Each structure stands twice: as structure tokens, then as C-alpha cells.
């Protein structure tokens, strides 16, 4: 399916499918030809068919820790489980209780997706509670939804009996350090803390990789992590470029979109263009009647209302309610690219951005407030 992790990985409660598919259709309607179910094993061979090739394969392969018992059939990677969940497949094969190893954003995606299927989840990680990699929203919302977080655990083995997973053997870690140069982890274990967390299956959310190193000769140089070696998106092979998570590792959707624009500019220059891909919009005269809010560039963000946890786990819908008309108007008033922007003086000193700093605007005739909301009176 087109869309990569947006349609086969990121949970629907975080990114509704309908909007993504609509965007994909816009792209197809513009004349882009998509070929699916075609495995590319040699980028250099593909280059013979085209003027340029872009490798944007993402990081769709999940990593597993080399634990005893990791080869049991009830052991999975986060990418496998998230793909099945996104496709609304039956997840009963996971059993009633699951241990998820890794408490980053992906680990929380798995845990919260399984909670919505009525599956109990123990989310475990080596990091202490204050060092967890997931953002605070995930941690708070996950706790509200029933995710059992077990931080500061080191993993010894996946236990099994009669060919089935029965639990995850761990011990408590008081502290740990990671040496980036050697990849070694040094831990201080709590004596006598070894225990087994009972579970029916184990899911690794311990990192992802491109999978390009699995091919005998993909045609471009890869670094030690299996990512393409690039310089301004150019790989080691002439006319072959790389972008997105395939060079940065897992990131945000908006970062991948930014990568797409940057590599498009690089490819355009390679093909003889100037690399300029920005749209030139029709010049319009500023409309003073839209109203002026003093210091509108520093108005706080209007936060969306979070649905109650009991309501959230009962479906896969967006966890946030939509803005009310008033809230939408307040948030839109913060736009820094509206017609009014052309009549605002730019900041000259960084100190202007500090608390208490003032933003001076040019005097405009016949101005009236865009909002009467007390929240914007300041």
C-alpha cells in the first residue's frame, strides 16, 4: 500500500487514514505513476531505466535483541504488529498479555494500539523513568489508557515452554550508561531483583533499519548502520539519491516531507535545473480589514482537548477533539503568513524574542480587532 509508515505503521488514533489517502490520491491525480508489489534489489540497475533514482525506503525493518528465546514463534517486531493493527487485522495471535521491549515513541505506539484491542501490555525498557525516550504526551496518555510501564529493566531471556512464550526474564537496573563509540552498555544492577514477567508474546520496539544491507549488492555505499552514505542527498552512485528516514533514521512525518523537498531540489540541479522548487503565488494586496491583534506573533498555541481515556481506548479515532469555531479562529489568528505579515516590521534584535520584548507594528488605517476573546486582550 502506498504511504509507507503513514498507512502501515503510525496508528490511526495518531494519524487518521482518510486524510493520508486523500493526499496520496492528489499526487496520483497529478500524473505520478505508482508501481506496487515490485521489489527493487539493485538501485544501479534501476538507474539504467531512468535519469535519476531516489531511494526513500524508510526504516521498515524491526530490530531484535539477541536474547535467548528470541526465536520463539510468539516473538515479533513492532513493525509487524503495527502493520497488522493499522490494517485492522485480528491480533488475537498475540494472546491476552504482551511484553513490549523498548519505551520510545514506537514502543508506545505498539502498547497503545494493543490496549485498544483489549490486550494487557507491560512496556519495559532499560532507561530509568526520567530518561525514557518517548515524549511526555505519549507517557501521560499511555498511563491514562492502562499501559503498565516498567522502566529500569535489563532483559535476560524470553522464557518458553512447549514451544510457546511464557514470560520475559528481567532484573532491575539502578543506573546505566551507553558508550556511543563502542556501543557498550554499562549497568548497575539491583542485587536479587531477577524476576519473570508473565506474558503470551513479546514485541521488540528496539530500533529499525532500512533492510538495504540484506541485499547482496544494492548498488550504493552503506554506512555501518546500513544507511546510505550521502552528501547533500547524493549517494556514492551517479544519479542515485536518498532521503527521508532512510538517511536520518526514524523521525517525524513533517521532517520526511522536508527531506522530500530538499532532495527534489538536489535532483533538479542534477538534471540541469536551478533547484528552485518553491511555488510563486500571485501577489495580493494586504487586506487591513482582516484586523490587527497587537503582538499576534507571540500568541500562545491553542491546545486541542484530549478525549477521556475510557473513550479513547474504545476506538481507533483521533485522541484529540477538533477545535471549536472560536478555537479555530484563535489558532488561525497566529498565522505568520497572512496578508497582515507584509505590514509588520521584522525583528532586528534577538532580545525582542525574550519575555517582555515588544513587537512593533506599522500604523494601519481603520483597524479593528479580529477577536473579542478575553484570551487575546493582552
What is each model feature region?
Residues 71-96, 158, 178-257, 291:
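FAD-site-proximal beta/loop scaffold in flavoenzymes
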Residues 1-39, 63-66, 112-150, 154-159, ...:
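Beta1-alpha1 glycine-rich phosphate/pyrophosphate-binding loop at the start
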Residues 243-277:
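A conserved FAD-binding loop/helix module that cradles the flavin
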Amino acid at each position: 500500500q502506498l504511504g509507507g509508515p503513514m498507512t502501515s505503521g503510525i496508528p490511526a488514533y495518531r494519524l487518521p487514514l482518510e486524510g493520508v489517502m486523500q493526499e496520496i490520491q492528489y499526487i496520483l491525480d497529478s500524473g505520478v505513476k505508482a508501481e506496487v508489489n515490485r521489489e527493487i534489489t539493485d538501485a544501479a540497475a534501476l538507474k539504467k531505466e531512468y535519469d535519476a533514482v531516489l531511494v526513500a525506503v524508510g526504516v521498515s525493518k524491526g530490530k531484535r535483541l539477541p536474547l535467548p528465546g528470541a526465536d520463539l514463534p510468539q516473538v515479533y517486531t513492532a513493525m509487524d504488529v503495527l502493520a497488522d493493527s493499522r490494517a485492522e487485522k485480528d491480533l488475537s495471535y498475540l494472546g491476552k498479555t504482551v511484553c513490549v521491549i523498548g519505551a520510545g515513541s514506537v514502543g508506545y505506539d505498539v502498547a497503545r494500539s494493543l490496549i485498544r484491542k483489549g490486550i494487557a501490555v507491560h512496556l519495559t525498557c532499560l532507561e530509568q523513568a526520567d530518561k525514557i525516550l518517548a515524549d511526555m504526551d505519549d507517557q501521560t496518555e499511555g498511563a491514562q489508557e492502562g499501559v503498565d510501564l516498567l522502566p529500569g529493566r535489563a532483559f535476560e531471556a524470553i522464557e518458553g515452554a512447549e514451544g510457546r512464550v511464557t514470560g520475559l526474564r528481567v532484573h532491575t537496573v539502578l543506573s546505566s550508561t551507553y558508550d556511543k563509540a563502542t556501543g557498550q552498555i554499562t549497568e548497575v544492577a539491583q542485587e536479587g531483583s531477577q524476576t519473570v514477567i508473565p506474558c503470551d508474546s513479546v514485541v521488540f520496539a528496539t530500533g529499525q533499519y532500512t533492510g538495504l544491507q540484506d541485499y547482496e549488492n544494492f548498488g550504493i555505499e552503506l554506512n555501518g548502520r546500513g544507511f546510505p552514505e550521502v552528501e547533500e542527498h547524493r549517494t556514492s552512485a551517479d544519479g542515485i539519491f536518498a532521503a527521508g528516514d532512510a538517511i536520518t533514521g526514524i523521525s517525524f512525518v513533517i521532517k520526511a516531507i522536508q527531506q522530500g523537498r530538499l532532495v527534489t531540489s538536489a535532483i533538479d540541479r542534477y538534471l540541469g535545473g536551478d533547484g528552485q522548487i518553491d511555488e510563486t503565488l500571485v501577489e495580493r494586496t494586504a487586506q487591513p480589514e482582516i484586523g490587527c491583534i497587537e503582538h499576534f506573533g507571540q500568541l500562545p498555541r491553542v491546545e486541542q482537548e484530549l478525549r477521556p481515556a475510557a473513550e479513547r481506548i474504545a476506538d481507533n479515532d483521533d485522541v484529540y477533539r477538533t477545535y471549536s469555531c472560536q478555537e479555530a479562529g484563535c489558532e488561525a489568528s497566529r498565522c505568520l503568513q497572512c496578508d497582515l505579515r507584509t505590514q509588520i516590521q521584522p525583528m532586528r534584535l534577538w532580545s525582542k524574542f525574550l519575555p517582555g520584548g515588544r513587537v512593533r507594528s506599522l500604523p494601519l488605517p481603520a483597524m479593528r480587532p479580529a477577536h473579542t476573546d478575553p484570551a487575546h486582550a493582552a
